[in-house]
Regions:
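N-terminal secretory signal peptides and thylakoid transit peptides that target proteins
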Residues: 2-21
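Hydrophobic alpha-helical segments
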Residues: 20, 32, 372-376
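Short, glycine-/small- and polar/acidic-enriched structural segments
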Residues: 33-217, 227-264, 430
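Pocket-lining segment of extracytoplasmic ligand-binding domains
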Residues: 202, 222-333
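Secondary-structure end/capping motifs
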Residues: 279-395
Length: 456
């Protein structure tokens, strides 16, 4: 899928507005150097067939990569492990990644490698779906209004089903896409908030099912509906269009979106090897500029979203029916068949500082890794911040973003004035507030999960 005529409209970079960087609390050192031509003009970027690969697709289809002097090849990957491995071994220059992947790799959970990110690709975008059988057992216990279930639906209701199955000796199984995926942590968060233990990772149980009430396993996103239809799993957490696909096929019902679990949660990032970023700083900034522009374009109008849906429906990208993709991408979400509700924030690509890599977002993922045993021992608050600063690169983001401000492509007000931390965040389904500066205090608030010196 290499773009033809890639030499068209190549542009040199300009420096950003240093005063804005200072106001944002970002070091000026990284911003003072004027980026030059890309060190590497021909690059290959990987993605998984999900609607939130949209910034990559839009940057390619709208010519934003070309504008930055890049000849980009986009390549779909079979699953998240293959994608990560190919970035690590250099077959891919960078990729659409789960927000937890650079962090997990850096701390050595699974494959050990130094992966960094300077760009968040989107906020929200996932949902939890259950099979028709499970939905039929849950529905009688739901509060109703106007003949429809009251949302958000909490896992307390699912617990009744799981407890009944447990008495019958039947295991309850659900799918998620990868051990360090947002989906894994969101599903675990929702289950635990409803009194269900989603299990722990241990040295002898790397599947994460120790002491579990609900058995979670990995299934690639496009295979989720078929795996549930076959009865291998009874529900799953995944990105779009694979929840809406279950509705379209009549095999399942989404019960909650991740926006209802954690408001404005960061979902995917653009990840590269740390060595690659050091060797190709101008190329890295060029990619970031193109993707920031793509995010801005995606959130600029409904007409743009509709155009993006058509792009994503192509076989080389998501390859799903445009109507199914459009359900969530254009601000609605269908739960039970015919129960279509407004969901204007289901996919956010630029608003709410969606592209900025906040340290506090990184630390939240690390707290969940500790909560479920992927981090096996107690760590001081300073450790969480040190890892976040090693992996998340807001100063590189600001260099790219300020260049776009100087070029008149985005506004200075589109960028946050921040030291890398959001304020205390509420909007979680269990009512627990999160302060990224106090990760251990945050962990202490949960009834289910490891904290302090706990071990499984």
């Amino acid at each position: 899928m290499t773009k033809e005529n890639n030499a068209i409209n190549r542009r040199k970079f300009t420096t950003g507005a240093l005063a804005l960087a200072g106001a944002s609390g970002i070091s000026l050192t990284a911003l003072a150097q004027k980026p030059g031509r890309p060190e590497k003009e021909q690059i290959k970027l990987g993605f998984i067939k999900l609607t939130d690969c949209a910034p990559l697709v839009v940057a390619y289809e709208k010519g934003y990569f070309e504008d930055e002097g890049l000849n980009v090849q986009l390549e779909a990957q079979a699953n998240w492990k293959v994608l990560l491995d190919r970035v690590i071994d250099g077959q891919l220059d960078g990729a659409h990644m789960l927000a937890g992947q650079p962090l997990g790799a850096t701390i050595g959970f699974g494959t050990k490698a130094d992966i960094v990110t300077a760009l968040s690709m989107d906020l929200n975008g996932n949902a939890i779906t259950v099979s028709n059988e499970v939905w039929g057992l849950m529905k009688p216990h739901l509060a109703m209004e106007g003949g429809k279930p009251v949302h958000p639906i909490k896992a307390d209701v699912l617990k009744k089903v799981v407890d009944a199955w447990k008495k019958q000796g039947k295991p309850f199984k659900m799918g998620m896409v990868f051990p360090v995926s947002t989906h894994n942590y969101e599903l675990r968060y929702w289950l635990a908030a409803g009194g269900l233990n989603p299990g722990y990772y241990t040295s002898s149980d790397i599947s994460g099912t120790s002491k579990a009430d609900v058995l979670l396993s990995v299934t690639p996103p496009p295979q989720m509906p078929a795996t549930m239809e076959a009865g291998t799993i009874h529900g799953y957490c995944v990105g779009e269009p694979w929840n809406q696909q279950a509705v379209a096929k009549g095999i399942g019902v989404p019960v909650i979106t991740d926006h209802q679990i954690w408001k404005h949660n960061p979902e995917k990032v653009f990840g590269v090897k740390a060595d690659w970023a050091k060797a190709n700083p101008n190329t890295h900034i060029a990619v970031l500029k193109a993707m920031i522009r793509a995010g801005q374009w995606l959130d600029a109008s409904m007409a743009n979203r509709i155009e993006a849906v058509k792009m994503l429906s192509k076989s080389q990208y998501v390859g799903a029916d445009a109507e199914v993709i459009g359900n969530s991408m254009t601000g609605t979400f269908e739960f039970e068949k015919g129960d279509k509700r407004p969901a204007p924030d289901f996919n956010i690509f630029f608003r709410n500082y969606a592209t900025y890599p906040f340290y506090s977002d990184a630390i939240w993922y690390l707290t969940q890794m500790r909560r479920w045993g992927q981090i096996t021992e107690n760590k001081p608050d300073s450790w969480y911040l040190d890892v976040a600063k090693k992996v998340y690169l807001p100063e590189v983001y600001m260099q790219a973003a300020n260049a776009l401000v100087a070029e008149g492509k985005i506004k200075a007000t589109d960028l946050p004035k921040t030291d890398g931390f959001k304020g205390v965040q509420s909007g979680f389904i269990d009512g627990v507030d999160y302060d990224g500066r106090k990760p251990n205090d945050y962990l202490s608030k949960f009834k289910i999960g490891l904290k302090a010196t706990d071990k499984v």
